[in-house]
């Protein structure tokens, strides 16, 4: 993941400045206009009673840069829920985990899928095939509609809070899961 960040100009900038998503980011986001990415982030966090400070600290990684990369991975998870339009159902959480795996290669996403699959109904398991297709569609550098999807750790989420949600979605090139499913139903 560090190598992917180092290979990208935005990723290098993030590694250099090491922004942290703290509770003050959530507080700032609560005051933004309803059409902004930040407002949606705050609504998601408040609806689920989450705080950025509630994330466990990264342990057992001696290299400070690698520890930061893992912390960023954890902190960006909630931004992913917002930009992908995924809630907190088991299905949606697994969809986000597959998305993360497609971006980072961390086996945690696949392990979550294997562990969570036992909790899914037959219909939900069938949906996972679509979620896999959706995650593949949104993999880094996968071209669809024109823009290349950046690896999500390289997206300066902290700088985009006051931007319109649609502008952030266009910048990332990520197709939200509900939009993808709607297009798939029409086919």
UniProtKB/Swiss-Prot annotation:
Cofactors demanded by this protein: Zn(2+)
InterPro entries, A to Z: Coq4 (IPR007715), Coq4_euk (IPR027540)
Catalytic reaction annotation: a 4-hydroxy-3-methoxy-5-(all-trans-polyprenyl)benzoate + H(+) = a 2-methoxy-6-(all-trans-polyprenyl)phenol + CO2
GO cellular component: extrinsic component of mitochondrial inner membrane
Entry keyword annotation includes Ribonucleoprotein: no
Binding locations of Zn(2+): 77-78, 81, 93
Disulfide links within the chain: none
EC number from the UniProt entry: 4.1.1.130
BP GO annotations: ubiquinone biosynthetic process
Localization per Swiss-Prot or TrEMBL: Mitochondrion inner membrane
Pathway(s) of this molecule: Cofactor biosynthesis; ubiquinone biosynthesis
Keyword terms: Lyase, Membrane, Metal-binding, Mitochondrion, Mitochondrion inner membrane, Ubiquinone biosynthesis, Zinc
Membrane topology term: Peripheral membrane protein
Note: This protein may be expected to contain an N-terminal transit peptide but none has been predicted.
Subunit structure: Component of a multi-subunit COQ enzyme complex.
Family: Belongs to the COQ4 family.
Protein name: Ubiquinone biosynthesis protein COQ4 homolog, mitochondrial
Organism of origin: Leishmania braziliensis
């Amino acid at each position: 993941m560090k190598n992917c960040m180092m290979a990208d100009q935005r990723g290098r900038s993030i590694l250099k400045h090491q922004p942290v998503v703290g509770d003050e980011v959530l507080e700032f986001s609560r005051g933004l206009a309803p059409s902004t990415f930040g407002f949606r982030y705050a609504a998601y966090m408040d609806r689920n009673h989450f705080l950025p400070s509630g994330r466990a600290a990264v342990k057992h990684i001696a290299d400070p840069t690698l520890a930061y990369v893992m912390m960023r991975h954890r902190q960006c998870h909630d931004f992913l829920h917002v930009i992908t339009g995924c809630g907190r159902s088991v299905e949606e959480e697994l969809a986000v985990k597959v998305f993360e795996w497609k971006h980072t290669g961390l086996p945690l996403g696949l392990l979550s899928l294997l562990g969570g699959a036992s909790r899914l109904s037959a219909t939900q398991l069938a949906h996972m095939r679509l979620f896999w297709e959706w995650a593949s569609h949104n993999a880094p550098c996968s071209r669809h509609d024109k823009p290349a999807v950046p690896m999500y750790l390289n997206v300066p989420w902290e700088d985009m809070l006051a931007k319109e949600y649609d502008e952030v979605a266009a910048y990332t090139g990520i197709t939200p899961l509900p939009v993808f499913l709607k297009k798939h139903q029409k086919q």
